[in-house]
Amino acid sequence: MKFIIKLFPEITIKSQSVRLRFIKILTGNIRNVLKHYDETLAVVRHWDNIEVRAKDENQRLAIRDALTRIPGIHHILEVEDVPFTDMHDIFEKALVQYRDQLEGKTFCVRVKRRGKHDFSSIDVERYVGGGLNQHIESARVKLTNPDVTVHLEVEDDRLLLIKGRYEGIGGFPIGTQEDVLSLISGGFDSGVSSYMLMRRGCRVHYCFFNLGGAAHEIGVRQVAHYLWNRFGSSHRVRFVAINFEPVVGEILEKIDDGQMGVILKRMMVRAASKVAERYGVQALVTGEALGQVSSQTLTNLRLIDNVSDTLILRPLISYDKEHIINLARQIGTEDFARTMPEYCGVISKSPTVKAVKSKIEAEEEKFDFSILDKVVEEANNVDIREIAQQTEQEVVEVETVNGFGPNDVILDIRSIDEQEDKPLKVEGIDVVSLPFYKLSTKFGDLDQNKTWLLWCERGVMSRLQALYLREQGFNNVKVYRP
């Protein structure tokens, strides 16, 4: 089997040296991706296309599908490469190849020609088109919007009978631009923004801020691995997980409610910038869109950017949510995003949409920055190729109950402000308050002869914290969802 890879048009307008470099990198990327399907395949680069030849016919569909997902490819032609003698020979070979496809259809013939011949491309189109029209009674010629377009390519003494054309994702080959670090949460925005930078030629590493246990991290790892495996597997990348729970706890205890959102984002940018510097990455990528939430106003985004010299790229800055969701659907991350948890504990009641720099800096003076330094230092760096095995391991399941027994106690894990605004009272059972950000250090002080039913407003944080406690060896925890 043979495929002809056509380059993304922006590659073809580069200078000769840049174009050759891009083609060389794309050729290497294709080899890296396809070697898993057929180790004997050949990838040969030319000035305006790349040839892929493989022997294992059983891998035809898999190879074709993989090619459509490699950045830098405009479209793929599946071809049959045969010698020819003259125009009549071209017609006869085209008749054998296309007769069944043209029965009862309108068609036209389109020819591209390279080399020296005694005929032009239009001559071949007319001759082959006329012959097909005469020999297939139910077919008729239609030059605009036909049912079938017969694509032929003539190169010197070879004829390429094009059996199918398949669109690629375009963009630049990964590795032609510098590395970036994507702040990934597993939602719609961060997945799409990561894909957009891969498509633009960047090797995308991932940085995840874990706010609540293993279950969420496993979900985000699955998203990152999916994106890498589908669009970027030609290169090795990192998945860096930072336990941000201590940072969130410090913010909730010491920072004014209205400033929490902006300060949390500033802390994330500080942490990600340190990770980027550690690994020589040139820029951060976020999924922020202008005005989507309170921290994404121009004033707040400027304040967030000010905490670091690292370039922050926001490919979705002008996109609306519907457009982002449509893109997520196209690339296959929509289902992941819809089931990804949102946190009920890290939400300001009255977030500022126009933060003042002096106020933000005054609030940050209350923050213990040694906590931030520590979580960055302890960040977990994983080769994304190892994630497939890790995510297959079962997460410890935690029982969810809607009632309670005589030895049960409800543990309200909401933040202090939420508890004061909406105190939880349940008839017939004691309710104890312990904010989620103190569970890791204070849960062991509670009566371990009791069964603790964790509760929060949405049920997401309580489940994740229960999973975390189970991982720490506490088996006397359940999730309470009345």
From Swiss-Prot:
Keywords: ATP-binding, Cytoplasm, Disulfide bond, Nucleotide-binding, Redox-active center, RNA-binding, Thiamine biosynthesis, Transferase, tRNA-binding. InterPro entries: Rhodanese-like_dom (IPR001763), Rhodanese-like_dom_sf (IPR036873), Rossmann-like_a/b/a_fold (IPR014729), ThiI_AANH (IPR020536), ThiI_fer (IPR054173), ThiI_N (IPR049961), THII_Thiazole_biosynth_dom (IPR026340), THUMP_dom (IPR004114). It catalyses: [ThiI sulfur-carrier protein]-S-sulfanyl-L-cysteine + a uridine in tRNA + 2 reduced [2Fe-2S]-[ferredoxin] + ATP + H(+) = [ThiI sulfur-carrier protein]-L-cysteine + a 4-thiouridine in tRNA + 2 oxidized [2Fe-2S]-[ferredoxin] + AMP + diphosphate; [ThiS sulfur-carrier protein]-C-terminal Gly-Gly-AMP + S-sulfanyl-L-cysteinyl-[cysteine desulfurase] + AH2 = [ThiS sulfur-carrier protein]-C-terminal-Gly-aminoethanethioate + L-cysteinyl-[cysteine desulfurase] + A + AMP + 2 H(+). SUPFAM superfamilies: Adenine nucleotide alpha hydrolases-like, Rhodanese/Cell cycle control phosphatase, THUMP domain-like. PROSITE patterns: RHODANESE_3 (PS50206), THUMP (PS51165). It is an enzyme of class 2 (transferase). It is found in: Cytoplasm. Changing residue 321 to R: Approximately half of wild-type activity. GO terms for cellular component: cytosol; L-cysteine desulfurase complex; sulfurtransferase complex. Residues 404-482 form the Rhodanese domain. GO terms for molecular function: ATP binding; CCA tRNA nucleotidyltransferase activity; sulfur carrier activity; sulfurtransferase activity; tRNA binding; tRNA-uracil-4 sulfurtransferase activity. Its main location: cytoplasm. ATP binds at residues 183-184, 265, 287, 296. The active site is at residue 456. The keyword Nucleotide-binding applies. CDD domains: PPase_ThiI, RHOD, THUMP_ThiI. Disulfide bonds join 344-456. Pathway: Cofactor biosynthesis; thiamine diphosphate biosynthesis. Its EC number is 2.8.1.4. The keyword tRNA-binding applies. GO terms for biological process: detection of UV; L-cysteine catabolic process; thiamine biosynthetic process; thiamine diphosphate biosynthetic process; thiazole biosynthetic process; tRNA 4-thiouridine biosynthesis. PANTHER family: TRNA SULFURTRANSFERASE. Belongs to the ThiI family. Catalyzes the ATP-dependent transfer of a sulfur to tRNA to produce 4-thiouridine in position 8 of tRNAs, which functions as a near-UV photosensor. Also catalyzes the transfer of sulfur to the sulfur carrier protein ThiS, forming ThiS-thiocarboxylate. This is a step in the synthesis of thiazole, in the thiamine biosynthesis pathway. The sulfur is donated as persulfide by IscS. This is tRNA sulfurtransferase. It comes from Escherichia coli (strain K12). The gene is thiI.
